[in-house]
Amino acid sequence: MKKEIIIGTRSSPLALWQAEFTKAELSKRFPDMNITLKLVKTTGDVLLDSPLSKIGDMGLFTKDIEKHLLAGEIDLAVHSLKDVPTGTPEGLVITSFTEREDTRDVIISKSGKGLMDLPQNAKMATSSLRRMSQLLSLRPDLEIMDIRGNLNTRFKKFDEGDFDAMMLAYAGVYRLEFSDRITEILPHETMLPAVGQGALGIETRTDDAETREIVRVLNDDNTEMCCRAERALLRHLQGGCQIPIGSFGSYIDGTLKLLAFVGSVDGKTGLRNEVTKAVKTPEEAEAVGIELAEILLSMGAEKILADIRKTC
């Protein structure tokens, strides 16, 4: 067995938390292994002046790390799964899906008021078209304002800027110990999360069987079933830019329930549906994702997505 493992990661506080978590979990199982981190600056860490909706988010936070992985300079890469494009580069594979944190989104507000109690025309900070679409469907009066940067930077910008509220993923807020700032946790009925939200995806080379075997011990089977279904749905619908799609899967006693949303950026058009099926394998879970994607397309999702792609 390998005596040394090099983990590639971004240098943001949340990315470092994720990498250190992975290192600690591997060290518990392989105490004699020397595990080190290699920090990689990604395009997404550099391009902070433009909204994600303008520059797209396809691999902004993963491509540069993947180059190091393909070159053999690192043995594995740890990503927020929601940042990982559904089509991984040839030669790479998501080997492990870690146990998922709470997938919901949260509201941070300066007034302490929740989403529906914010004042008329409140200024809401988010860089996500998925959140924007669902927010505007509920509160068309909101003024959506872009906010970029790592979590610590966003909190600083929010506190110092002209914002009434901000929306973030619970998982990151919790992991970096900002939970005391949460005003409201939004249920899935209100806000479906990003595909893979709350889970880590550990990526390895397909030809590195030894590392894949090592990393596989961190896999959570329930998380894999849900995330494989969500990612299959996104892959079946996805264009080349950021689009307003949300999805959440739950897998209990052999039954997978998959929810999904596709909406227009202005929130005026939104489609939701779900599929519930008994599944036994990740491949069967992916088939559920494709089935739900086809249902959404038959409901009119293609027109919504085509209109959005015209602006990409």
From Swiss-Prot:
Binds 1 dipyrromethane group covalently. It catalyses: 4 porphobilinogen + H2O = hydroxymethylbilane + 4 NH4(+). Disulfide bonds: none annotated. Pfam families: Porphobil_deam, Porphobil_deamC. One of its GO terms (molecular function) is hydroxymethylbilane synthase activity. It is an enzyme of class 2 (transferase). It comes from the Bacteria. Its EC number is 2.5.1.61. Pathway: Porphyrin-containing compound metabolism; protoporphyrin-IX biosynthesis; coproporphyrinogen-III from 5-aminolevulinate: step 2/4; Porphyrin-containing compound metabolism; chlorophyll biosynthesis. Transmembrane segments: none annotated. Its cofactor is dipyrromethane. SUPFAM superfamilies: Periplasmic binding protein-like II (SSF53850), Porphobilinogen deaminase (hydroxymethylbilane synthase), C-terminal domain (SSF54782). GO terms for biological process: chlorophyll biosynthetic process; protoporphyrinogen IX biosynthetic process. The modification S-(dipyrrolylmethanemethyl)cysteine is found at residue 241. InterPro entries: HemC, Porphobilin_deaminase_cofac_BS, Porphobilin_deaminase_N, Porphobilinogen_deaminase_C, Porphobilinogen_deaminase_C_sf. CDD domains: PBP2_EcHMBS_like (cd13646). Keywords: Chlorophyll biosynthesis, Porphyrin biosynthesis, Transferase. Tetrapolymerization of the monopyrrole PBG into the hydroxymethylbilane pre-uroporphyrinogen in several discrete steps. Monomer. Belongs to the HMBS family. The porphobilinogen subunits are added to the dipyrromethane group. This is Porphobilinogen deaminase. It comes from Chlorobaculum parvum (strain DSM 263 / NCIMB 8327) (Chlorobium vibrioforme subsp. thiosulfatophilum).
